[in-house]
Amino acid sequence: MTKEIKRELTAIMFTDIVGFTALSAKNEREALSLLDQQREILFPIIHKYNGSIRKEIGDGLLITFRTASESVQCGIEIQSTLKSNQELKLRIAIHEGEVAVRGNDVLGDDVNIAARLEPYSAVGGIVISGRVQQNISSLPEYKTEYMGHPELKGVAQSIDIYCITSNNLPMGKKIDSLSQENKISPRPRLNIFSLTGAILTFAGLIFWIYVGFFDVSYGSANEVPSVAILMMENLGNTQD
């Protein structure tokens, strides 16, 4: 039987273990041990703030919360707890939006946005979207810093990014509003196709002028020139 799909407004958290891919390629046993350690440390904190662990994606966690403030407070406690841990280092991203919920699965554009925000987090830090920032801006215990307005792959929405600086959490790098390739405005370059088009247009104009003014048909030598005589009406009082 197909489970009912519901829509919910929720805070969405993504976590990711720093360096896990490289570790799993070198030492699978240590990588698996790190996953066990993550569950042991994070799960009790997540449940403390009424978070729902929706999915484990390799070393990443997808978690939802009822409110933005609960998700931020949970993230702060997680990162504060891990400060002394030399093995387990996380990046955390939080966004808020409407998602489709079926059983324990959550889907939607806002889930994708939360995932796209995560790489902008500093190691041991937390990044949040502008929506989360708006919801916690009146709460003095949360300090944030604006990072920028990136273009997120596969995301049509306009997203501002902030980082949490409460509890001495590290701040991520400022984000240029332009993409990496366009950070420095390039000098104007003459496109070869534009140049070719301009030359052809100019040549066509010259040809048209030449044909219009100099290609006069004189006819054959036996032809007698004809003169057109037009009747004119005398509008004056005197005869000419």
PLM regions: where:
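A short, flexible beta-alpha/helix-coil linker loop
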Residues: G19-F20, G97-A100, M232-T238
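Catalytic beta-strand-to-alpha-helix segment of the class III nucleotidyl cyclase homology domain
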Residues: K3, E40-F43, H47, L62-S158, ...
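An acidic helix/loop motif centered on a single conserved Asp/Glu
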Residues: T201-F202, G212-D240
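A conserved hydrophobic position in a structured secondary element of the catalytic/binding core
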Residues: T15, I128, L230
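Short loop/turn elements that form and flank the Walker-type P-loop nucleotide-binding site
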Residues: K6-E8, E87-K89, E223
